[in-house]
């Protein structure tokens, strides 16, 4: 399938799909005409990238974890350092949540004072 078709099937923009390729996350075959040819494997990869991205992971972490992701759900094959990486990411998310909660508390306090 062509990149536009993959975009429609996955909900990921053409621009982002090209970025994934540039970053080495996708490696579609090339037709004789030079057009990219995406198959079912690339579609599964894009869905896995999306899953990890929606979990709040950065691209470098996704690149590291992608070979360990078995399905479009959070199922992992035991790859080296996966636990440490996931724990680090969870700690980072906890830190962001704490920061957001503090910001929310400040804004809520302002609203209460303003009536």
Describe each region flagged by the PLM.
Residues 2-8, 40-115:
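Arg/Lys-rich, alpha-helical DNA-contact motif
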Residues 6, 13-16:
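Short glycine/proline-centered loop/turn elements that form peptide/ligand docking sites
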Residues 8, 21-22:
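Alpha-helical residues within the helix-turn-helix
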Residues 10-11, 34:
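Conserved beta-strand-loop-alpha-helix junction that forms the acyl-donor binding cleft
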Residues 17-20, 49:
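Conserved hydrophobic/aromatic packing and binding residues within compact polymer-binding modules
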Residues 22, 28, 54:
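Short, conserved catalytic or interaction motifs in soluble domains
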Residues 26-33, 37:
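Beta-hairpin "wing" of winged helix-turn-helix
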